[in-house]
Structure formats: C-alpha cells, structure tokens
A protein has these predicted regions:
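Acidic/His- and Gly-rich active-site-bordering loop/insert found
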Residues: 4-98, 103, 107-127
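Histidine/acidic-residue-rich, glycine-tolerant segments that coordinate divalent metal ions
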Residues: 56, 76-78, 84-97, 103-104, ...
C-alpha cells in the first residue's frame, strides 16, 4: 500500500467510532427527503446551502484540485427496519427506513472527506476537499437546486459512492436530473355537439409522453 493511501486510512481508522456513530444515528433517525434535520446536524452545524435547510457544504484546504464528495442521508416511507436483521422486521409499524443504505452512503462520504483532509494536512500539498450534504436524493430534489445555483462550478471532480453487493470502482459519470414542470391547457367543448371546437390537453400530454419515450432511446 502506498504512503498516500496509508495516511488516509490511518485517519479514517482514528475516527472510525465517529463515522460508525453517524451511520447508526442516521439509520435510527430515518428522516424523509428534505426533513433530515437531525441527520444533517451530525455532519455540520451550518446548513442551509442553496436555501435548503438540510443541505450543507464543509470545506478544507486551498487551491486546486478541488474535489467534491457527495453525502446523502434521506430515508423512505414505509421501510422501517430493525438493524442487524436479514429479514424484514419493522422497528416502527409503517414507519420510515433506509431502502438502499443511505445511512452508510452519508457516513462513507464523511470517511472519504476525513481521509483526504488528513492527507492534505500531512503532505502540505495544494488542494481543497468539500463535503456536500445532498438531502432529498430519493426524490431527486436537492442536487438540481445546487446545480442551479452553480455549486459545482468550482469543482474539478465530484465523487460519491453507493452501497452495493460488491466492491468496485465505477469510472463512468452519472446522469443529471433536471426537474421541469409542464402545464397543459385545453379548450372545453361538447364531445357530441361541437367536438371540432374542443382542444384536448390530454392529447398533448400523450403526444409529449410518446415523444419523450422515443427521444430517450436515442440519448
């Protein structure tokens, strides 16, 4: 193992109790999208990035490269689960829970930031690491607003990870999510008496849906 990797791993091991505490607490809190108030407090005392109460950005270092590490920590409704169980066992009937390990995703991102911070401190190399708290991921919410406000423009790279059934490095990019709201308007008319005067908003919705389906195949 290289010295650089060892520096980072030693720092992570030193803080492992804190990292595990964060993972366990986020699991227990199981807060829904954009309601992760206690979960966000585990990371940072100052939230409110981009006007989102449970989003945050915490940086260390100076100069380039500037690496962003993305943490997520929201839960899903109806997925309450006792920890340490291999079968579904609700902790709270009908309660919230983590469907794909976002408690680990957030804690693992924190561990990565701790490792990079330690490397920057001990080597004196130029560079900046920023840990971004990205709430509401299950609904595709916060990152869209963070992109809108230009939060990523300062970065040379943004990295994240996700719990899986194997360990691997995925070098490809992720698809962007842009939220858009469309409103369709029609013109009311009697279907039998004067159908030619009507304009169906539903027809427009169906045509757009078909067009998007064909477009997606070629993107």
């Amino acid at each position: 193992m290289t010295l650089n990797k060892q520096l980072a791993l030693d720092a992570i091991e030193k803080e492992q109790n804190t990292i595990l505490h964060v993972a366990d607490e986020i699991w227990d809190y199981a807060e829904l999208s954009l309601q992760e108030f206690r979960s966000a407090k585990l990371y940072c005392e100052e939230e409110g990035v981009c006007g989102i109460a449970t989003a945050f950005a915490a940086s260390f270092g100076s100069g380039r490269p500037h690496i962003g590490i993305l943490a997520e920590y929201d839960a899903l409704s109806g997925l309450s689960q006792q920890g340490g169980q291999l079968v579904h066992a609700e902790r709270t009937p009908g309660g919230t829970g983590h469907g794909c390990g976002h408690n680990l995703l957030g804690a693992g991102a924190l561990a990565a930031a701790i490792g990079v911070k330690a490397w920057l401190e001990q080597t004196g190399c130029p560079g900046t690491v920023t840990l971004y708290g990205c709430p509401g991921e299950e609904g595709g919410a916060a990152k869209a607003f963070m992109a809108r406000d230009g939060l990523w423009k300062q970065l040379d790279a943004a990295l994240t990870w996700h719990p899986e059934d194997c360990n691997e490095v995925i070098t490809g990019g992720s698809n962007a999510c842009i939220q858009v709201q469309y409103t369709f308007h029609g013109v009311a008319s009697h279907a039998a008496g004067a159908p030619e005067l009507g304009r169906s908003a539903l027809d427009a919705v169906e045509l757009m849906n078909i067009g998007v389906q064909f477009l997606r195949e070629h993107m």
